[in-house]
Amino acid sequence: MADNFLRQVYVAISSLPEWKMSGGDAGASTVKLFGDGSFDQLRIKFTLHKQQPDAAIPSSIQIYNLSKELRGELSKVSGAKVKVSAGWANAPVVEVFTGSMLYATHQREGADIITSLFVLSGWGSAHQAACIKTSAQDATVKDLVLEILNDPGLPGITVDPKNIVIADQSFGNQGWTFAGSVRDALNKLSSIYGFSWWIDQNVFYASDDTAGALPGGEVVISSKEGNLLRAEPMLSLAPDRNQQYGITITSLFEPRLKAGFSVKLESELNPQLNRSYVILNLTHVCDTHSDAWISQVEALLYGVV
């Protein structure tokens, strides 16, 4: 029976673009797909990338042997809202991705037809929203970021000031003027004033490059808990000695991990690496029908740019 299988993945694909659904899903039809490793359910694979700062690297979702009709419909849709939820049958299933579908492809592999959805969180909102701004001379960088996020805003994206940790730098006498997309405006500001921004689960985040982890629940990856698979230091190749500046961690799939937030390592084999780190890059690699069910983390020591 299907309920004997522990891994579970749900994929929901809306008929409407993500940036047109800020008021909810009313008026949209949704295709819901499910896989759990059993032969009578779909095989679903995904590689989900989450970065801090935003690098606009698409994630991919692969679904095996969809109907010809559904494959045809997916080929016509661009910008559709996509949600992925995953977890274990004996624990709550967690939403791990919300974003826009950029495009879909189909290929035959042996007896299977594989549909690949390429998706990106916040892509539609950040690219569709136009930004024309001139700041006041006494405005701070954080003031302007919040102003951009509120007007023109990012449709469908949640903005909470507590997720924006930027120093109160002033523009001074020169002010600041920009015309373009919201994404380009934020990229220009971040490159000049030393902060990173990203969108995860349709929530906006920004942090100074030296601010450390954003406030929130720290996730522990531990030998004792059985979720740690591998941990290796990231070393700078200094002329006189190798100096650790971060860590790479491979764990069992851990949906609570978030880019920009803290992860704590508790390794019995490498206790010298045990401490808290700031997650820079995070990738979830999962497959309902193979051994792949992991999370891969690149994280920095606090204070490392």
Placement of each model-derived feature along the sequence:
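Assembly/oligomerization scaffold segments
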Residues: 1-116, 288, 292
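Generic structural motif
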Residues: 11, 44-46, 159, 164, ...
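An acidic/polar, Gly/Ser/Thr-rich interaction patch typically located in mid-to-C-terminal regions
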Residues: 46-77, 210-211, 215-305
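Charged- and aromatic-enriched interaction segments used to assemble
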Residues: 109-224
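Extracytoplasmic/secreted envelope proteins and their assembly/folding machinery
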Residues: 98, 142-146, 183-187, 232, ...
